[in-house]
Amino acid sequence: MRLTQMPSEFQKALPVLEKIKEAGFEAYFVGGSVRDALLHSPIHDVDIATSSYPEETKQIFPRTADIGIEHGTVLVLDGDEEYEVTTFRTEDVYVDYRRPSAVSFVRSLEEDLKRRDFTVNAFALDETGEIVDLFHGLEDLEKQVLRAVGVASERFNEDALRIMRGFRFQASLGFALEPETFKAMKTLTPLLEKISVERTFVEFDKLLLAPFWRRGLASMIESQAYDYLPDMASSQDKLNRLFDLETDFTFESSEQAWAALLWALEIENAQSFLKSWKTSRQFAKQVQDLLIILALRENGELSKRDCYRFDIDLLLQAENLRQAQGKEVNPQAITEKYQSLTIHDKKEIQINGGILIKEYGYQPGPDLGEILTEIEFAIVDGELENNREAIHAYLREKK
């Protein structure tokens, strides 16, 4: 099969392919970018595979960087563009179900493609637009099927993260998992405990943000993979609550997706849960804030102080999630209340602790903090104007 129209992303990278071929080596576009081109989907990263060894690749191009040379990858700088150029390779026995004990560089494209995870990710594309399809990936693409390359159990034993990647690809593509492939995934889910939490988080996060997240999540639940994810053992019934969200709902952000997950799991302490997933503190705080906003909305409308406390983006994401839960929402009222606030940060207050100490004789300590907080909320509540004269009058009354 030949592409009738080479996508612009590939056209831009053609000079790199051509230089490698002029030097006497093979070179192809490979991986997800080729699949996306066939599906007429946006192309993100253009990866190149070649028969040239890393040192040979570096001799072809004047500007390169070693970013993973032990695995055969050289970063080629071409004008303003950067391309990862990786030598065809085979991989030895995997250790810890995560990484090969050794990588061997080879001159054979077929040997390289054999180690790929799924047939729809095992294409190669040459400079003429010809598709190299050694594992019937085009047929699987047509049938919308995710099938492991070769023996499925071997692929997942090599790198157990491929199990999560399978669920994630199902969520992003909407494809069905081929029965033998899914059977192997279900059998080998205990291996997920061998995978770093950070890598697992990335795949689960991409699954939740994908357009067909329901399909990927349903397969993950059926496989009982959740039993081997941090703090999610025996959570099938609770995870199924996510399917109660509106049928066409997709998550706006990672924070919203994980807030929904914790809502489904009935977990109130996001910081503790997400610490197990080794996320950033900032991410955990925003997820926690979303859960707090959802809880506040269960008790009625948000107050001015509520709107002041949280970022408007989080307030609206929480409202969006409430709508997906089938609850009454009023994003316009929340936006108007937020915009009506005199201040959105205490740094905007026209006085500070230094002024209170200098002009009013306050001493550093709890009393100073209390009066500053009192002023802050009086301004937020609309009871006090945010100017020095009004604040001074307020303080004189207090004195």
From Swiss-Prot:
Q: Which InterPro entries match?
A: Bact_CCA-adding_enz_type3_sf, CCA-adding_enz_C, CCA-adding_enz_firmicutes, NT_sf, PolA_pol_head_dom, PolyA_RNA-bd
Its protein name is CCA-adding enzyme
Q: Where does ATP bind?
A: 32, 35, 116, 159, 162, 165, 168
Keywords (alphabetical) are: ATP-binding, Magnesium, Metal-binding, Nucleotide-binding, Nucleotidyltransferase, RNA repair, RNA-binding, Transferase, tRNA processing
The misc remark on file is: A single active site specifically recognizes both ATP and CTP and is responsible for their addition.
Q: Where does CTP bind?
A: 32, 35, 116, 159, 162, 165, 168
Q: What is a biological process (GO) this protein takes part in?
A: tRNA processing
